Amino acid sequence: MYPSPVRHPAAGGPPPQGPIKFTIADTLERIKEEFNFLQAQYHSIKLECEKLSNEKTEMQRHYVMYYEMSYGLNVEMHKQTEIAKRLNTLINQLLPFLQADHQQQVLQAVERAKQVTMQELNLIIGHQQQHGIQQLLQQIHAQQVPGGPPQPMGALNPFGALGATMGLPHGPQGLLNKPPEHHRPDIKPTGLEGPAAAEERLRNSVSPADREKYRTRSPLDIENDSKRRKDEKLQEDEGEKSDQDLVVDVANEMESHSPRPNGEHVSMEVRDRESLNGERLEKPSSSGIKQERPPSRSGSSSSRSTPSLKTKDMEKPGTPGAKARTPTPNAAAPAPGVNPKQMMPQGPPPAGYPGAPYQRPADPYQRPPSDPAYGRPPPMPYDPHAHVRTNGIPHPSALTGGKPAYSFHMNGEGSLQPVPFPPDALVGVGIPRHARQINTLSHGEVVCAVTISNPTKYVYTGGKGCVKVWDISQPGNKNPVSQLDCLQRDNYIRSVKLLPDGRTLIVGGEASNLSIWDLASPTPRIKAELTSAAPACYALAISPDSKVCFSCCSDGNIAVWDLHNEILVRQFQGHTDGASCIDISPDGSRLWTGGLDNTVRSWDLREGRQLQQHDFSSQIFSLGYCPTGDWLAVGMENSHVEVLHASKPDKYQLHLHESCVLSLRFAACGKWFVSTGKDNLLNAWRTPYGASIFQSKETSSVLSCDISTDDKYIVTGSGDKKATVYEVIY
C-alpha cells in the first residue's frame, strides 16, 4: 500500500558550500609572508646596488689608468716625433759632407728605416710584453722573499708588467692587427680582478693601522669623508686665528716632498711678506771704518731688500723673507748627471706604495714630478743598515723597491750618485743612537733663537721682545729664572750668542741695534748697545778669542764689531740680498756667510777679503762649519742640505727634509750635525755623507737649534711658542 522506502538514494552533486571566511591569524600570516618576500627582494636589490657601486669604482680606476696611459702615449708620441724630425734634419745637414756614392747609400738606408710594417711592429711589441711579464714575475718573487720591503707598483712600465697585471691592452697593440698567437697560453687575462688583487696585496703589505687607507671606498664612505673634511676645515679655520704655528715667510715656496721612509707629509702654506728697503753703506764713514768689497759679479742687482717677516697675525717671524729675484747670468746652472728628484718618489704616499691620483700637467711635454718616468726602471734603493743584515736576508738594493736613497755625492764633474755608507756610519764612539725629549720650556711666544750655556745649566730662548733664561739642571722647573727685555716689545729676536766665559750675552733681531748683556751682575743688565745702519740682524757669530762679534745684516753686509771698544770696525760687502746665516772656523781665520742671494761666501779675517763664493739654485737659510774638519753644511729654502768641502769640489746633497731648512748646528766632536725645518723635523746626520742617525718630529716649524758643548743635549725652538730639550743617547 505504501511504497517501500528508498534505502540508497541516487548519487548526486555535493551539497552547496557557504562563503569562505578568513581569520585574523591567516591574514597576519599572509602579510608576514609578503613582508619577508619584499625584504628578501630589497636585500637582493641592495646587494646588486653595492655590486654596481663597486664595479663603478673599479671602472673609474680603470678610466684613470687608461687616461694616464693614453696621455703618456700621447706625450711619448709627440716626443718621438720631435726626435725623429730633429734627427732627420741633422741627417740632411750632414749629407752634403759625404761623398756622392755614400750620400746615395745613406738616403736609401734612411728610406728603408722609414718603412716599418705591421708585422715588425707586432714582433717588437711582443718582445716588449715578454720582457714586461718577466719583470713582473721577478718582482712577485722579490715580494715573497723574507725581509724584503713591499714592491712599488707605481714605478713599473705602464705598458709592460703593469698592463699584464691589470688585464689592459699592452700599449698601442690594441690598435694593430693582432695575430692569434698574441697572448701567451700560460698567461690568463685577469679582467677586473687585477686592480682588486693589487689593492689587496697593498693592504696586506702595510701595517694594520694603515690598511683602511688603501681600501676601495663606497659612496657612503665618500659622503662621510666629505662631512668629516668639512668639520676639519671649520676647525682649521678657527685654529688659523691663533699664532700657534709659525709660517716661514717664503715668496717662492713650493710643495716639495721628500722620500722619507715613513712617508709623512706636512702641507706647507705660503705667506706674503713685506720688504723694507735698506740703504747700503757705500762710503767710508767719518770714523774711519773700513769697508771691504770684493769685485762685484756681472749682472748682480745693486738694490737690496730687507725682508720683513710677516704672518697671518702680522706678528710671527720666519726665516729671512724670500725675495723673488732674477738669477744672475753667472749663477750656477743645474749640474749635469742624475737628477735626484727623478730618482725618488715625490708625492705624499709612502715609499713603496702607488702614487696619488693622476693629475694632468699643464705642459704636455712636462712630466709631473710625482709620476714615475715611463720606461725607466725604478732606482736602486739604498740601505744604511747593511752591516747589520745577516747573509740569509738579501740586500734591499737587489730588489726594485724599498727605501729610496736620500744622500747623494757630487763629484767634480757635477754628477750625483747615491752614497754607499761605510759600515761604521751609525756606530762608533761619539755617534748617538737617538735623542729623548726630557723637558719643554713654555716661552709664550714663537722661539726664533736658542743657545745653551757651558757648562750645560742654562738655556736662553729668544722670542718677541725678550730673552728668557731657564735652568735645565732641575727637570721639574717649568718657570724661567729671569727675563731679559731686549729690543722693542713687538720685535722678534733672531739670534742670541753667549761668550765662552758665560758672563756676556749678545742679542740681535728685528732692530738696528745689538744688545750686550752683563750676566755676571746680581741682576742681568744691558751694558752696551751696538747700532748699525741695517734695520735687522739675522744671525751672530763670536770669534774664538771673544774679542770680535760678526752680525749678518738684512742689507747684505757683514758687520764686524770690536766688543772691547764697542765700535764697528769693518763691513764685508758682497751679498746682493740679506745675509741670513753665519759661522766661523775654529781657528778664527775664516768666516762663512749665507745669503738670500743664493750664495755662500767665505771671508779671510786676517786679510779682510772674500776668498770663495759658492752659487746655489735656492736661498740659503742656515749653515754650519764642522769644528774638526773642512766640511761646511748648508740648509736651503728648497729643503736640501748640502755638505761642501772647503777646498775640494766634492759635496753631498741630503734629501730628508720636506720644506725649508731653517737652522743647522754641528756637534762639538764634528762627527754629526743636526738640522731643523719648516716640516717640523729635527734630523741628525753623519758628517759628511749624511747618514740619518735619528729623526724627531715636533708639532710646529722648528726655527732654531743648539747643541751643548759636551754633545749631550739638544735644544730646539719652534713656532708653537716653546723650546724643547732633548737628551742625546749614545
Curated annotation (Swiss-Prot):
GO terms for molecular function: CRD domain binding; DNA-binding transcription factor binding; HMG box domain binding; transcription corepressor activity. Pfam families: TLE_N (PF03920), WD40 (PF00400). Ubiquitinated by XIAP/BIRC4. Ubiquitinated by hyd in response to Wnt signaling, leading to degradation by the proteasome. One of its GO terms (cellular component) is nucleus. SMART domains: WD40. The modification Phosphoserine is found at S205, S207, S218, S242, S258, S267. Its main location: nucleus. GO terms for biological process: cell differentiation; epidermal growth factor receptor signaling pathway; fibroblast growth factor receptor signaling pathway; negative regulation of canonical Wnt signaling pathway; negative regulation of DNA-templated transcription; negative regulation of Toll signaling pathway; negative regulation of transcription by RNA polymerase II; nervous system development. Residues 296-308, 322-345, 353-362 have a biased composition (Low complexity). Belongs to the WD repeat Groucho/TLE family. PANTHER family: PROTEIN GROUCHO, TRANSDUCIN-LIKE ENHANCER PROTEIN. Transcriptional corepressor that regulates transcription when recruited to specific target DNA by hairy-related bHLH proteins. Maternally required for neurogenesis; in the segregation of the neuroectoderm. Directly or indirectly interacts with Notch and Delta. This is Protein groucho.
